[in-house]
């Protein structure tokens, strides 16, 4: 490709509204342009990378036995009513009506459509297992689109759906897709982790996310220093506290704490160790509890894990904290003075709190705390659950090593849905005994456009993008210096361009009438891995200059050897 025939829309300055590196560089490198909030046009350079990601994903998903389809972006609203997700999805699900006032939605995902298809097309267990996928545009009406294509409203996604006769078959399909994801991300040259995850709004039981590791990642992931255990912060657990609770050494005393509204203030003003304090949080209860409010108790230096809390049957979902007015109406005290002693509300205690002794907590009286509290003696322990976020250094639940925390960008997610959707939509087949069997489903997604941004977050320097070879828009750049003034340079550049393209190598030939500095800057900015510089001075010595984008190393290569040198670099 010649730049004279190409839309190379690079920018010198970083746009003000670009927050993260990938967004900045995608704009500067001429990969995308914003059309409206969360909506982007993919320019040629960006589209070439997007297609590279698509093709790798397609090849590995095909190799896993899946079959490609293509489903409409517009879906009938009635399908979403069948599964009950029409309301669960909330405002992210964009609804509209056609000219006949029939309700539709713009597809954020396709479980309903694919389940409807399979229930109409598949009737016998002999047609199973079946795994169908598509690479298609999706739309989620994000409240606050940001970070460019990382959190856009419209995005490109691979979504696959497996159908099996039983759970054993589902587990095989799930493992095959897990392995395909690993192969795809390995080929892309990304540093990533598959991690245990919560199933969220999709539903089902087991699920894993795939995270590209990057400091700018929105998600926090925990993994063992000694094993392959890994989970996102929502799902991560520490090993259960070991040992027995220590015997009491203090009497419970009521202490005036007028200026201690937070755990930090309590610790500072009264000399308590923070790990000897607890905080009590009032949240809305579910219908399973004979109360409007339930209390959750975690250690003072720990944070409540909202997803773990939401997953408790006693807690309303989505999680909603009680207001100050509701607290005072119940116990006559406000936040900062709450605790388990004398609390006439159901409460659940975190595992780390259950093994505490001689601890401090609010007294359910404004500006007062109890110190020296002990379970059994001063208050009954009751229900114990894992309620907290893990912290770095916690013992791994697998029993090997401790937990490390790193930031990651979620680029893929796989779910064992079970029969959540197939049962709701009566998707079954005749089994070997002639009876109807509801199918076991798996669903699998890769954010194709998000992978592009994630790769940049992991591969860049102050000059621009450093693409892994498998994702680069072009493999090789040819930069002829002052080509329009030197016939020798022009002839050598044209000859090399013809040779490399004839070999199937993707080459960007910079034939613009530009200063060499501009040409070099653009090639570095868009991240082409291998650059060949052709100039009069080096040619007089019989050489071209080869530059490796990742290492920055420059090498003089004999003109006669340049093609073989390039081939060697691409292997």
Swiss-Prot record:
One of its GO terms (molecular function) is proline-tRNA ligase activity. One of its GO terms (biological process) is prolyl-tRNA aminoacylation. It is an enzyme of class 6 (ligase). It holds the Pfam family tRNA-synt_2b. Its EC number is 6.1.1.15. It is found in: Cytoplasm. PROSITE patterns: AA_TRNA_LIGASE_II. Its main location: cytoplasm. The keyword Aminoacyl-tRNA synthetase applies. The keyword Nucleotide-binding applies. It catalyses: tRNA(Pro) + L-proline + ATP = L-prolyl-tRNA(Pro) + AMP + diphosphate. One of its GO terms (cellular component) is cytosol. Keywords: Aminoacyl-tRNA synthetase, ATP-binding, Cytoplasm, Ligase, Nucleotide-binding, Protein biosynthesis. Consists of three domains: the N-terminal catalytic domain, the editing domain and the C-terminal anticodon-binding domain. Homodimer. Belongs to the class-II aminoacyl-tRNA synthetase family. ProS type 1 subfamily. Catalyzes the attachment of proline to tRNA(Pro) in a two-step reaction: proline is first activated by ATP to form Pro-AMP and then transferred to the acceptor end of tRNA(Pro). As ProRS can inadvertently accommodate and process non-cognate amino acids such as alanine and cysteine, to avoid such errors it has two additional distinct editing activities against alanine. One activity is designated as 'pretransfer' editing and involves the tRNA(Pro)-independent hydrolysis of activated Ala-AMP. This is Proline--tRNA ligase. The gene is proS.
